[in-house]
Regions:
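Bacterial N-terminal signal peptides that target proteins for export
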Residues: 2-12
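Bacterial N-terminal signal peptides
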Residues: 11-20
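Surface-exposed patches in mature extracellular/periplasmic domains of secreted proteins
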Residues: 113-116, 167-169
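Phosphate-/polyanion-interacting regions in eukaryotic proteins
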Residues: 117-118, 149-150
Length: 341
């Protein structure tokens, strides 16, 4: 009997370790759970979706069924039935999409309730484009071919040249990096250099498909040379103290709020959103001399099903009403001659 209980406990611990990307979680601790099988004690609002249905402009929602941690599809928004505009948006401003859509629909009421948008990382959105707009999440597979795609300006230019996107590339705002930490900053992280310290657990964007990783690498090298970048993205990945995220704008704050990581580099806007949402998150500023700037841009996808709608959104995205929404989260309007990407 004791052997079977021990095996069950080990299996439970192994599962918890696997789902958290190699970071050991307190949930596997029999002392914390009083040696009993219990439902998690997590606060429901720690888990996405964090907008409580606001990032969905569907007019008829039918039966509501959202279960944080289990059934939520937090990066897929709107009604897939018959959209009049499909947007693939690099997820760095998922939180700004609801007010942007509301303003767009106010200006263009014919589109009310007819937008569908996705906010997974830009590299993964390209994979979806290459798959004909088809994606599978959990047990569900659907197809939503994009009308417009949004990412860093350099990537947009690259895909315009390759023929995937139609010219012109439309830049609209810029963003800078910050270090996101739990509200009480228990690891006392004060700078990028601190991220190389042994024992500091990091949640970092994956260079394979998250464009922010390029800017982070540049910032780390400015702060501590190649040695710091290697420590964060090579040495600490190898020893398990850096976990690479799949969707940094969802996972980094989630890991921090659960105590699974001590810090992670994100866009400043993402930390501001978490703070405005009242989550137990704060940030550590990165000096301008060490920081990197991203230029956000978009373009119509070649062969878009709704080219008129795509052009309307691309015109709207750098209008004054749209820029005012972006500025709530620390974005700055793009000005010609700005450097970044």
């Amino acid at each position: 009997m004791k052997t079977s209980i021990r095996r069950a406990a080990l299996a439970s611990a192994a599962f918890a370790l696997a789902v958290c990307g190699g970071v050991r979680v307190a949930a596997a601790d029999p002392v914390q759970w009083n040696g009993k099988a219990e439902a998690p004690h997590y606060k429901e609002d720690v888990f996405p979706p964090w907008q409580h249905g606001q990032n969905n402009d569907a007019l008829k929602r039918g039966f509501e069924f959202t279960v944080p941690e289990v059934d939520d599809l937090a990066d897929f928004h709107g009604d897939i039935t018959d959209p009049k505009l499909v947007l693939y948006v690099g997820g760095n401003y998922f939180f700004a999409m609801a007010p942007l859509v509301v303003e767009f629909e106010r200006e263009h009421p014919d589109y009310k309730g007819r937008l569908y948008w996705e906010t997974i990382p830009p590299g993964l959105l390209i994979k979806q484009i290459e798959a004909g707009g088809t994606i599978t999440s959990g047990n569900m597979t659907w197809t939503a071919r994009p009308d417009a795609y949004f990412a860093g300006l350099k990537k947009i230019d690259q895909f315009v040249k390759s023929g995937l996107l139609a010219s012109p590339a439309v830049p609209y705002v810029t963003n800078t990096l910050t270090i996101m930490v739990p509200k009480d900053n228990p690891a006392h992280v004060t700078s990028l250099a601190d991220l190389g310290r042994p024992g500091i657990r990091l949640a970092m964007p994956n260079p394979a498909f998250e464009g922010i990783a390029r800017q982070i690498d540049a910032a780390l090298k400015k702060a501590g040379g190649a040695a710091l970048a290697t420590a964060v993205y090579k040495t600490k990945v190898a020893d398990g103290s850096t976990v690479l995220t799949h969707i940094h704008h969802r996972q980094t704050p989630l890991f921090l709020m659960q105590g699974l990581a001590d810090a992670g580099v994100t866009w400043q806007s993402e930390a501001m959103f978490q703070e405005q949402a009242g989550h137990a998150i704060t940030h550590v500023d990165i000096p301008t001399a060490q920081n990197s700037t991203a230029i956000y841009a978009g373009a119509m996808v070649k062969g878009a099903a709704h080219p008129k709608a795509a052009k309307l959104w691309l015109g709207f995205i750098h209008s004054q009403p749209a820029l005012a929404i972006f500025e709530r989260y620390g974005f700055k309007p793009y000005t010609p001659g700005a450097t970044g990407g």
